[in-house]
């Protein structure tokens, strides 16, 4: 019996659909793109259970003719292209004729109500497990309404690997927000249950969408960039050097109004920001590039998430130079202090001042003999310690992180971690962050946050984790957003990951010069920890070099 055989059409369709439709947010993205291509001026999205149970999209676009409707759900059926040459002249978002077919293949049921401007009556279509079950006349309004139910019910393995409903909802909110920014002439609305997560008004500029996406405070801190190249134009908004944010960078890139990932654009922005951002700060940027279709390949990724420019160097230079010019104009950084010429020195130490430190740790955790001596500090990062058996290098940041983590964990377990603020701090969240806050409100309470709704997407923070170093309103806003975004990837260990993040954020940093007393205090606290060997993330805190190893290095043995 042959071991290789040709798959049946249904299996092939489901495999292909899995490349296009990865999660509920993929469905929302594809449906929005279809609505935009249909000339919609208003798009309303409603979801239930993070889009797993229901995704409903209603638009006022051109609608679909009755004879075309069944074809729209067949693979490679499209009105956008006819030949391979058309791929190099594309100006629409959808073009491969795979989206609707893929959605129907991985859903239990899809229902469509649609009507064109010139039709006296609309059409209703129901598909079950990818096959047409019913089609009839319908008295629906102009435009199209699509309901997708039971996503991935026919593919249990894919359903099993979805995140929680709140995390899937956060991803949907991100997609809607991204589309609303670049397609600002269209009004968008996203709701889950009875709650409206996002709403934008149609506008000639993207100012309103930026405010609704990032909040007024963040949007006001952004500066405009503009540039031209051979066959392309770009414009965008980037955060100024003093309005950047903590955490990972947030760079939204659009090519011909399509949200994509572009390594070239991201690298160009990073290069522009070099020297402008303080340690731990990241840029926020929204970049739109309009380029001749023949100069960009949008068919690189199955889900159209990545593009490839024909002349990458020109795009890189244009983005970098435009961002650099805007950053220099918005603020001139203070010149660095004149360099001090000194003899080369590996570490700072004062031999005449010796500090000894008795260690009291459990036998199985013992790192050294009961008495050690602080030699000094190397590279403003490592504390050098000597004992009878050799030397130890202690990573000061990892050590401080371990100390703070165990302190926060102890307070969390005892229920004494919450610290009430003298003045509540108001925080405006993105639609995705609102979804995560609803999901993780209990866990946030466990680690010391007390947060109340304040209207719209604004929230009042009344208490924060004690000993977390959250002193300013800005630091509270930043850390809350950072912790919420941890929930996108670590649902099961959210509380522990949040405590690790708090510990890392407030710890002594690399490059910080410490006095002898500060080093002594740090080591005392470290060796009192339950686990002084590693930081909360698993990196080593202490590296030992024995006397015997040193002698071998220098050929004494």
UniProtKB/Swiss-Prot annotation:
GO molecular function, one term: ATP-dependent DNA damage sensor activity
Keywords per UniProt: DNA damage, DNA repair
Transmembrane segments: none
One protein family per Pfam: MutL_C
CDD domains (alphabetical): HATPase_MutL-MLH-PMS-like, MutL_Trans
KW DNA repair (keyword) present: yes
GO cellular component: mismatch repair complex
GO BP: mismatch repair
Entry similarity comment: Belongs to the DNA mismatch repair MutL/HexB family.
Function: This protein is involved in the repair of mismatches in DNA. It is required for dam-dependent methyl-directed DNA mismatch repair. May act as a 'molecular matchmaker', a protein that promotes the formation of a stable complex between two or more DNA-binding proteins in an ATP-dependent manner without itself being part of a final effector complex.
Record's protein name: DNA mismatch repair protein MutL
Native source species: Methanothrix thermoacetophila (strain DSM 6194 / JCM 14653 / NBRC 101360 / PT) (Methanosaeta thermophila)
Designated gene of the protein: mutL
């Amino acid at each position: 019996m042959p071991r290789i055989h040709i798959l049946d059409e249904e299996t092939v369709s489901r495999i292909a659909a899995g490349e296009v439709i990865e999660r509920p947010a993929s469905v929302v993205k594809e449906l929005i793109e279809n609505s935009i291509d249909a000339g919609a001026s208003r798009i309303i999205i409603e979801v239930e259970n993070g889009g797993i149970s229901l995704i409903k999209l209603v638009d006022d676009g051109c609608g679909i003719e009755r004879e075309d409707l069944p074809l729209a759900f067949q693979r490679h059926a499209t009105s956008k292209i006819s030949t391979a040459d058309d791929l190099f002249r594309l100006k629409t978002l959808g073009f491969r004729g795979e989206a609707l077919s893929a959605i129907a293949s991985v859903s239990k049921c899809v229902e469509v109500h649609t009507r064109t401007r010139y039709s006296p009556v609309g059409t209703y279509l129901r598909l079950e497990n990818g096959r047409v079950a019913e089609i009839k006349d319908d008295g629906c309004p102009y435009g199209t309404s699509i309901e997708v139910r039971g996503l991935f019910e026919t593919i249990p393995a894919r359903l099993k690997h979805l995140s929680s409903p709140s995390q899937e909802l956060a991803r949907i909110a991100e997609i809607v927000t991204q589309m609303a920014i670049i397609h600002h002439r269209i009004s968008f609305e996203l709701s889950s249950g009875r709650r409206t997560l996002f709403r934008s008004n149609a506008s000639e500029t993207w100012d309103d969408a930026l405010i609704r996406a990032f909040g007024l405070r963040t949007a006001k801190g952004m500066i405009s960039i503009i540039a031209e190249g051979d066959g392309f134009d770009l414009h965008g908004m980037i955060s100024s050097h003093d309005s950047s944010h903590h955490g990972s960078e947030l760079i939204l890139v659009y090519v011909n109004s399509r949200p994509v990932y572009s390594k070239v654009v991201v690298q160009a922005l990073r290069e522009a920001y070099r020297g402008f951002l303080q340690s731990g700060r990241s840029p926020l940027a929204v970049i739109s590039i309009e380029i001749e279709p023949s100069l960009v390949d949008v068919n690189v990724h199955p889900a159209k998430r990545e593009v490839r420019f024909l002349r990458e160097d020109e795009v890189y230079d244009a983005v970098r130079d435009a961002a650099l010019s805007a950053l220099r104009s918005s603020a001139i950084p203070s010149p660095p202090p004149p360099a001090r010429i000194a003899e080369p020195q590996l570490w700072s130490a004062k031999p005449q001042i010796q500090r000894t430190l008795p260690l009291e740790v459990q036998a199985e955790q013992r790192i050294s003999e009961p008495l050690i001596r602080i030699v000094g500090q190397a590279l403003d990062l490592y504390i050098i310690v000597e004992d009878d058996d050799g030397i130890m290098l202690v990573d000061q940041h990892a050590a401080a992180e371990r100390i703070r983590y165990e302190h926060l964990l102890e307070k969390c377990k005892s229920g004494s971690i919450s610290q009430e603020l003298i003045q509540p701090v108001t925080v405006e969240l993105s639609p995705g962050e609102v979804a995560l806050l609803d999901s993780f409100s209990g866990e946030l309470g466990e680690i010391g946050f007390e947060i109340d709704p304040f209207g719209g997407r604004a929230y009042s923070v009344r208490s924060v984790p004690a000993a977390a170093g959250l002193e300013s309103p800005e630091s509270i806003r930043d850390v809350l957003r950072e912790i919420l975004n941890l929930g996108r990837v670590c649902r099961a260990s959210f509380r522990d990951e949040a405590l690790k993040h708090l510990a890392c954020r407030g710890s002594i940093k690399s490059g910080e010069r410490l006095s002898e007393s500060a080093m002594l205090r740090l080591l005392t606290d470290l060796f009192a920890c339950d686990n002084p060997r590693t930081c909360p993330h698993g990196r080593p805190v202490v590296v030992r070099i024995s006397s015997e190893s040193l002698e071998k290095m220098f050929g004494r043995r």
